Curated annotation (Swiss-Prot):
Record pathway: Cofactor biosynthesis; adenosylcobalamin biosynthesis; cob(II)yrinate a,c-diamide from sirohydrochlorin (anaerobic route): step 6/10
Gene this protein is translated from: cbiD
Protein name in UniProt: Cobalt-precorrin-5B C(1)-methyltransferase
Broad class of enzyme this protein falls into: transferase
Protein's GO biological process: anaerobic cobalamin biosynthetic process; methylation
Reactions it catalyzes: Co-precorrin-5B + S-adenosyl-L-methionine = Co-precorrin-6A + S-adenosyl-L-homocysteine
Keyword S-adenosyl-L-methionine: yes
Length: 362
């Protein structure tokens, strides 16, 4: 088997989520208000009990409150917020508890289907709980009986959000504050997978019955041209086919179209649910075998086995009128069919490098 985009493994660093950054900065700003002490480091406890110290970029008093910021270090995770300034602006209020607001660069929820209600700042439940627990402990330590108003912001967050799925999810004005463990694990892409699940939830909550999970922009364009689906029905799954298929077990839809490049679909057809080259490779001998089942001669099968890429294998098959794209889609559909509930109508589409549909199975 050949890997079309080989990568050299290297040691990778862990990082911290925007939720951890928000917790650290809100705690530092609140502590300044209650004690008069401005910190340059702040200790927080992550949801699984780990204690971490986070460095602050600033911690200072403001008119009527205090603010603190930190530079988000995502480690070696491919994250649009890596290096961004995450900050909290805190005011003391009479009513106990914590009230959250969206500061500059943090979005507001405008569609049903997410874990946060419509009209609320896009600060997810675990970061909210982390901040609430840390601020409650601080208040108890200093005998403070009032509450806190906390606005979380991200510098340049509105522009960064355009590189995420937030606009499609109906989160407007900026980024989401995320995290379930407080730690960013390198290449776990947990935030990306969570956004896939959110996309499905939002589609369902808004009455969408046919969703299309696509590996990239070209496959989205192909599905949009074929079916005229609205953006809310398009799920950008990237390489995470398994994240879509497994989630549909508990959040079912009437109809699912899976669309991707021929090479990606051939990986799914071979049973791989993570389509990235780190985790799965193009299986040219298997493509040759499938071509043989579709009528390819022994000579053509040999040429496919010796091909440099999946696209070359496809071109060879098409030149001899062998429907390799349809065969791959049929196998990919079978893999998907084994995972999703029986009531889901599953279709698979494969496209070539020019975005043309070269395989269909339904």
């Amino acid at each position: 088997m050949r890997d079309e985009t080989p990568e050299q493994p290297a040691p990778l660093r862990f990082g911290y989520t925007t939720g951890s950054c928000a917790t650290a900065t809100s705690l530092a700003a609140a502590r300044l208000l209650l004690t008069g002490h401005a910190s340059d480091m702040v200790d927080i406890v992550l949801p699984k009990g780990q204690h971490v110290a986070m460095r602050l970029a600033f911690c200072r008093a403001t008119d009527g409150g205090a603010e603190a910021g930190t530079i988000k270090d995502a480690g070696d995770d491919p994250d649009v917020t890596h290096g961004a300034l995450v900050f909290a602006r805190v005011r003391l209020v009479h009513e106990p508890g914590v009230r959250f607001r969206a500061g500059p660069g943090v979005g507001t929820v405008t569609r049903a289907g997410l874990t946060i209600g419509v009209g609320e700042p896009a600060i997810n439940p675990v970061p909210r709980r982390m901040m609430t627990e840390h601020l409650a402990a601080l208040a108890a330590e200093h005998g403070y009986a009032g509450g806190f108003e906390v606005a979380i912001g991200v510098e340049n967050g509105e522009a960064l959000a355009r590189k995420t799925m937030n606009p499609r999810l109906g989160i407007v004005g900026g980024l989401s504050i995320l995290g379930t463990t407080g730690i960013v694990r390198p290449f776990s892409c947990s935030a990306y997978i969570a956004s896939i699940h959110q996309g499905i939830d939002v589609a369902r909550a808004n009455g969408v019955t046919h969703i299309a999970a696509c590996t990239g922009n070209a496959s989205e364009d192909a599905v949009r041209a074929r079916y005229g689906l609205p953006d809310i029905a398009l799920i950008e799954m990237g390489d995470f086919a398994g994240a879509v298929l497994k989630y549909l077990r508990r959040a079912s839809v009437e109809r699912l179209t899976l669309c991707g490049g021929f090479g990606k679909l051939s990986k799914l057809a071979a049973g791989h649910l993570d389509l990235h080259s780190r985790h799965s490779s193009i299986d040219l001998p298997r493509l040759a075998q499938w071509a043989g089942e579709a009528g390819a001669s022994a000579v053509l099968q040999h040429e496919i086995r010796a091909a440099n890429t999946s696209q070359q294998a496809l071109s060879l098959a098409l030149a001899h009128h062998v429907p390799l794209g349809d065969v791959v889609c049929a196998h990919a559909r079978r893999v998907a069919r084994d995972i999703v509930p029986d009531e889901v109508d599953v279709e698979t589409l494969a496209i070539d490098r020019e975005g043309r549909i070269v395989g269909v199975a339904r």
